[in-house]
Amino acid sequence: MSPRQLIPTLIPEWAPLSQQSCIREDELDSPPITPTSQTSSFGSSFSQQKPTYSTIIGENIHTILDEIRPYVKKITVSDQDKKTINQYTLGVSAGSGQFGYVRKAYSSTLGKVVAVKIIPKKPWNAQQYSVNQVMRQIQLWKSKGKITTNMSGNEAMRLMNIEKCRWEIFAASRLRNNVHIVRLIECLDSPFSESIWIVTNWCSLGELQWKRDDDEDILPQWKKIVISNCSVSTFAKKILEDMTKGLEYLHSQGCIHRDIKPSNILLDEEEKVAKLSDFGSCIFTPQSLPFSDANFEDCFQRELNKIVGTPAFIAPELCHLGNSKRDFVTDGFKLDIWSLGVTLYCLLYNELPFFGENEFETYHKIIEVSLSSKINGNTLNDLVIKRLLEKDVTLRISIQDLVKVLSRDQPIDSRNHSQISSSSVNPVRNEGPVRRFFGRLLTKKGKKKTSGKGKDKVLVSATSKVTPSIHIDEEPDKECFSTTVLRSSPDSSDYCSSLGEEAIQVTDFLDTFCRSNESLPNLTVNNDKQNSDMKTDRSESSSHSSLKIPTPIKAMIRLKSSPKENGNRTHINCSQDKPSSPLMDRTVGKRTVNNSGARKLAHSSNILNFKAYINSEDSDIRETVEDVKTYLNFADNGQI
């Protein structure tokens, strides 16, 4: 392979585009995307494109760079120990997600264990961005004068991925002053690094676990947070209190998380608190950002009405697909209240409140299915059912009122326990072309009933995996770190991680770093194999960008129009029975519970086949083709 050029970085001046190779040898299988490859209609629509929340953020990139620059440090490599990066000694894996994975590490300067989130700049999954998104972004960059030469699809996706990371770091840098938010320490990057390294505080118990054999089981993780008299209700109340404080802080900062779920809530044994993590999908109110734009408020409202997050945790006001007559979301902070309600319901009932065989059936149930039968007079239970999971957003409790209820022990609701809002029992139906189309499909398929005890199969597919809990010494000694942390073997009854693997090699993520330092060994190991090995470890339920995500069914219905790479399978075809990470199942008694969620909600085996309906000779079905086209436009653009 010929010498490689500089790789784009979080801080653009570290690797100016003029010094970068736009087409690399490992990307020759993917033809470059050029303006001539686009249709005239696309060029026309681009010239008339409305400003968006994303484009306004892009136009103010210098302000964002000024805010994140103090937290981004250049990578250096020790010439004696290849298992270190800067001051961090890297240890065992702590889990993986759709876009990267986390390693346990020890900071010699801080004298404590930290978490290092490693995000490859080149997306693992080529389906992460559609061809339309990539072409639109290239055209935008050209129109702004940011690029002057043709660019390959892979190079464009790399830059888009870096922008996504930049936004997440920007958000995390503004949210560092609350104990219930995972604290950003710093980020590491280099023009020779294939990955971005985000360093945060270590949460020793990992992601919030909720799936258990029996509804009344108490998970070992819970007992380390609630020390005395731990029960399902006391633990759920603890999570509610901690998350309420976290959301109150986000509200004060003008931040809407948009992806609250168990896998984005981390538990720390030392502080005995739950913390919110992963701000890649969040947005900030225009008033809270350090720049302004005449179109910002309108763009913000349009962004709020895009489906972002994990299907089972999405609020009903976002589930009205295809109805473009009005915006259903006016208070973005109540999206987070609903998602928190779903999370608490999972803890209380050991199941999701709404789930279907595919995401559209899930959306249908979120809108239509009532939870009134779950009201039982219990204060915590009814607070969750009647106030957090209130379908009518105008009646759903606000974060300010939730704080008051928890701090003053106010009554849950002025209404009788046996009552529930009319919107929850008989929600208003808003007919649109997409809703009409899927209504027909679901009618033809026939609805399948799921009994309470038959929930396990669906529930596991509906949840994201849980980061393993890893024990460390409270005061780890630097000299014996390799034995106390890097080679630790936690109690198998408490943890589900594969911890016997070797420490990560920095050479897997740095390309020809030694070209600028002859005293260092040659570090030219490519990380493609590492990325390939980790592809099956990814969670498929997270957002794909800071501003918009394509759900798996959207990726599926694009059919032939997605970027392709040799050796890559679309995530729709991934095996659902194969574990999604090297995490091991936790054995409880004679039964096994896998809180890692090997199968994901969106990867339903009975996902809808659009081609079968489009190609059908049935006249009734063919009438829906226009509705399909309407949805395809919605899937790519977030609007009709």
UniProtKB/Swiss-Prot annotation:
Q: What is its EC number?
A: 2.7.11.1
Composition bias (Basic and acidic residues) maps to: 530-541
Organism per entry: Saccharomyces cerevisiae (strain ATCC 204508 / S288c)
Q: Specify the enzyme's EC class, one word.
A: transferase
The UniProt entry, under Gene3D superfamilies, shows: Phosphorylase Kinase, domain 1, Transferase(Phosphotransferase) domain 1
Quote the catalytic activity from the record.
Answer: L-seryl-[protein] + ATP = O-phospho-L-seryl-[protein] + ADP + H(+); L-threonyl-[protein] + ATP = O-phospho-L-threonyl-[protein] + ADP + H(+)
Q: What is this protein called?
A: Serine/threonine-protein kinase ELM1
- The chain positions of domain Protein kinase read 88-420
**Which co-factor is required?**
Mg(2+)
Going by the UniProt record, its keywords in alphabetical order are: ATP-binding, Cell cycle, Kinase, Magnesium, Metal-binding, Nucleotide-binding, Phosphoprotein, Serine/threonine-protein kinase, Transferase
